[in-house]
Amino acid sequence: MKTKHLAASILATLGASNAVFADHSWNDYHWARTTSSFDLTIINSTTPDWDGYVSQAISDWSQSNKLNMIEDVNGDTSSRTRRKCNAPDGMVRICNLEYGQNGWLGIAGISLDNQGHIITGYTKMNDSYFNMAYYSGDDWKQSVTCQELGHDIGLGHQDEDFDNESLFSCMDYQDPPYEYPNRHDYDQLGIMYGHTDSYNSYSNDGGDGGDGGGNGCNAPPGKGCNKGESNSGQSIGWGRSVYKRGNAEVFMRIDPDGTRHLTHVTWAIGHENDHGGHDGHQH
């Protein structure tokens, strides 16, 4: 099987860093396809209370003329599946669960083949926060669902400063949140998918995709289930810190088979310094 590189982006409960970017692709990550548009299967493994938000986000992203998200409404909703949230190669799985009060509302992760194309993705929605009164509204749930699925197709954030003026996009950090993509999001997808490739990564056969960080472990480095040695390829969870700037931090874990896992974290205010294992550098 091809070596996979897994990257994850985490939306925190509150956090701030970086400014507005005109180009908000996520490091040019995209799904390989041989046609100008493609159908991407989203396996819905959320509980019924999330179905409406997932269906709405899938419909919104399908307004792009470059991709059409197809909802698989028969996704397994067992707690085991939702904790790991693995997706088959060529597809995306979205899950919800009480993952713990660890500072994030949602995670989006992608796995890359050896040519740098996305071959699988996943999204986790953290009910430990969405069950709280502050985050229980439709606006937060819809916005985070929209944003994390946007990451799964290769989009980054338009802005990561909660205090900036709203850009009216779910790919913008803002409070109160905005629930839908905007024209710039669709234009960015048009640029990212404005070419064709020599093969289709969305139709690959294979086993499970990324597991959302550490085989279900969602604890910060040095805490709880994530007590592996930070510089070891055997470490579990997020691994070692390789970058930190304000409330933003990036962790890397390397598996014995060479698979690399990158996790981008935007810490909640008050959480940026209460985790262990930082051995990276600040900018």
Model-derived regions, located:
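Post-HExxH zinc-binding segment in Zn-dependent metallohydrolases
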Residues: F168-D197
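Sequence contexts marking disulfide-bonded cysteines in secreted/extracellular proteins
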Residues: K84-N86, I94-N96, M171, G216-N218, ...
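Intrinsically disordered, low-complexity regions enriched in glycine and serine
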Residues: D205-N215, H278
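Second-shell loop/turn segments in exported
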Residues: L40-W50, Y129-W140, D172-E179
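Metzincin-family zinc-dependent endopeptidase catalytic domain
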Residues: D51-N164, I236, V242, I254
